[in-house]
């Protein structure tokens, strides 16, 4: 099948930049959305490389009996794919952080990061001063992937201090191998930001 993004906004999208490292098969989109004459915010959407592990390889991983029996068949392939996936996501993480706007406008970053909260990617996002909307506002288990690997949270909604998260919901609908996330947020007024500093 095909994949891609659609953006629906009642506000004009001022510019559109897509960054794609030639070594990567995925992308980072950065848009500036103008709310009114004075106010804008950035919306960043990204899709990081997955491990590319096949259904057969997932069954191999999930079935402990096969670990010894099928090591030659699947073991080397799985290890190679894991190594490649980690390296690619490290590069994409570094590209994303490098390309983030450096002004003080509200910033939202969302997408399929294909990485867990224990990953290098997740920790680099925290180091960049971003916050995870799930940690801030969710009241449920964080599973966003509905494939055969259970309880994976690999889709994120990151934001900076100029955004206030109001609500976070996972829509339990499986039209894809990921659950949709529905996030409500407010953009903080300048006075609120001044009070916090």
Model-predicted regions and their roles:
Residues 81, 85-88, 146:
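Pocket-edge positions in alpha/beta enzyme catalytic cores
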Residues 48, 112-113:
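Active-site metal-binding loops of divalent metal-dependent hydrolases
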Residues 58-82:
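A solvent-exposed, charged loop/short amphipathic helix patch at secondary-structure junctions
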Residues 1-60, 169-173:
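Structured beta-strand-rich core segments of catalytic domains in phosphoester-bond hydrolases
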Residues 1-7, 67-72, 117-120, 142-147:
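A broad, low-specificity signal for short, low-complexity segments enriched in glycine/proline
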Residues 44, 85-109:
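His/acidic metal-ligating clusters that form di-metal
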Residues 32, 98-107, 113-197:
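Metal-dependent phosphoester-hydrolase catalytic domains
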């Amino acid at each position: 099948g095909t994949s891609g993004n659609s953006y629906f906004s009642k506000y004009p999208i001022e510019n559109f930049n897509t960054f794609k490292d030639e070594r990567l098969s995925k992308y980072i989109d950065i848009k500036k959305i103008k709310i009114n004459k004075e106010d804008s915010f950035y919306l960043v959407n990204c899709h990081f490389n997955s491990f590319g592990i096949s259904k057969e390889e997932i069954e191999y991983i999930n079935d402990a009996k096969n670990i010894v029996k099928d090591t030659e068949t699947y073991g080397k392939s799985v290890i190679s794919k894991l190594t490649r996936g980690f390296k690619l996501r490290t590069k994409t993480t570094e590209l994303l952080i490098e390309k983030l706007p450096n002004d003080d406008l509200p910033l939202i970053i969302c997408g399929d990061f294909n990485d867990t909260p224990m990953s290098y990617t997740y920790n680099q996002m925290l180091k960049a001063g971003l916050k995870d909307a799930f940690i801030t506002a969710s009241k449920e288990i964080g599973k966003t992937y509905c494939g055969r690997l259970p309880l994976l949270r690999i889709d994120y909604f990151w934001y900076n201090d100029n955004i206030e998260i109001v609500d976070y919901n996972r829509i339990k609908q499986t039209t894809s191998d990921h659950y949709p996330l529905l996030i409500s947020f407010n953009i903080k007024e300048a006075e609120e930001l001044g009070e916090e500093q």
